[in-house]
Amino acid sequence: MSDPRKRNSAAMTDGPSRAPARSYLKSIGFNDKDLARPIVGVAHEWIETMPCNFNHRRLAERVKEGVRAAGGTPMEVNTISVSDGVSMGTDGMRASLISREIVADSIEIASVGHSFDALVVIVGCDKTIPAGAMVLARLNIPGLVLYSGSIAPGRFRERDVTIQDVFEGVGAHAAGKMSAADLMELENVACPGAGACGGQFTANTMATALEFLGISPPGANTVPATDSGKNDTAFEAGRLVMSLLDQGACPRDFITRESIENAITAVLATGGSTNGVLHLMAIASEAGVPLELEDFDRISARVPILADLKPWGTYVATDVFKAGGLSVIARELLKGGHLHGDVRYVDGQTLSDVAAAAAETQGQCVIASIDNPIKETGGLLILRGNLAPDGCVIKVSGQKREVFSGPARVFDGEEACFEAVIAQDIEPGSFVVIRNEGPAGGPGTVSYTHLTLPTSALV
């Protein structure tokens, strides 16, 4: 009699008629015992074009070990990724947001095509993170997302540096404030190994969101990419997905209106990326949960900023880990009544459970208390007007002023803007408008980070 947990894979592996399929699988090392167990997909985006996903194959091996230890048979799947940091300022950036759909679609196709009973998606670079949640919500088979971790800061002349410093170094060099030799020295040390961008850019914003969404194990996403504990989180993810399979617990059990509001709250409280709006709306859509732009504005009006994180602040994701992790932020937000405490994580704990167990590092300066926030309201605003009648998103995490007035410089594309910046042809106090970078103009809905390179040069 087939294992009742083989809800999908029995059709692929069981019975005399499936002998050809079993023969194929036995040719690459699977045996009858393996094929009698539930089949768990382990998907990742290892690629040799970026540090963000460079540890995925190693983590996938550990996830697979965890699956086997809990009585399942893992099957590894690899798909593509596009690095914003590498492609920025080139035509390759047009592929960035499109890659989110391709990652989700390709994992879905592999999962359906090979009758996976459950799925673990290892994610790293910006667009892979929402893609992992999107495909789980779409398939709605037992599964979870594991973030492969943030990069550690580099060291440059006795201070910590990140890729943000390199971007700003490009502007400093263009302005004659930094020599080519110094820029090269900075370039060589800013990124010391595997991991996604260290600031609260898109990757760490979405890794934060997915923990509060409940679709990632609590505490797992904040463990840095090169920390020895990352292997342990991967092994436990493999064991945990088998527990979800035993229970019949599926992603849409966790991705609810309340958990999405928790994720939005976490993005706002950490000064997260505008891309958080774009991606959370896509995840909600896949899960069948209604979500509007106004929901972000409503929550932002009452949620304070508690984490002092780059690009506007002082610290990076590895510092959040050292300070006690996202559970400390959850504890403070829960104190202020900003979270739904009864929302469950994939490991069965509620958010209240996780917050109650928070272990804050004494003397840490990264995460503020709810009684003394860094800023009284959240880091994102939704605006409407003649330039954006359907709404637009702006990030105000590091801004104190509420009004800006200045002459507009309008460019038809990022390339023209960047040329003007490098030529120092933009007056201080100008309002820079870059047109034709949307779905039709880009084309392909060029990511907001496409603008990072020229705006970082405005120093």
Regions found by a protein language model. Give the residues of each.
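Active-site cavity-forming subdomains of large catalytic enzyme subunits
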Residues: 96-262, 267, 272
